[in-house]
Amino acid sequence: GGNRDYSSFVVSYLKEQGVEELAYVIASHYDADHLNGVVGALHAFSCGQVLAPDYVTDTRVYESFERVIKEQDIALAYPAVGDTYTLGDASFTVVCPEVYDPKEDNDNSVGIRLVYGNTSFLICGDAGKAEEQAMLDSGVTLDSDVYLASHHGSEGSSSEAFMRAVSPTAVVVSAGAGNSYGHPTRTVLNRVKACGAALYRTDLQGTITVTSDGTSLSWSVDATQDYRDGDEVAAGAADTTGTSGTAGAGVTDAAAGSTDTTGTSGTADTADSAAQASVAADTAGSAAQASGGETAA
């Protein structure tokens, strides 16, 4: 959930959605651009359980994460592949990592596949090719309607084989407008186009929300036809591929699980969509990604 400055943005966004308590908060991993908003959400809302990867790191934001969990006596779980959690009429299953490696960071990302009725969502944090291959080898179900592109559309994620297994109808890329990492990369954008999925980009379109009623999906914005990579967007290159979106702030690793009587809402990165649940999971997550504040590659 964004850099420190964006923690209040994540909290404000969730409050605007009517969130009062969180059944689950998922910290995909401990990079600052995924964890700061999580810490803010834990301070602001009552939380039933936190799901996080089983490793430690020597950073101030991780220390803050540990502190708020202890101070508020929040249940903390290190989920395993196959663990399933219920959210009203929806549920989500952990799809990665197969093994927690203390030497890894991005490939320790906790990934979930969320299902509500006939709709499904795949969110895997900053998982790279090694973790993607482990998912493919394990045989977990990956096929999903909506795929939140791992690692902000980095070339080291969303391999061709993985994209074939997911077979998404829509791909959301959460990346900061004008970020210095070139996210999303040309390679990943080409893979999205090749699989025929609709493309949504927070660097061009700001906050993106997808809502499921268990049968169909509703989007807050139209899909973009702009396939410029992150470097081209940062350089101000003209869009020759289609229609550009509108740059703005977005919310994308923080929280899952407040009452939503209208259906399932999902916000691209947190974070992190569920029946009777508002999901901000790596989907309330990185406000920094969506407003040009990426700090981790």
Q: Residue ranges of each PLM-predicted region?
A:
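Non-globular, low-confidence helical/coil segments that flank catalytic cores
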Residues: 1-297
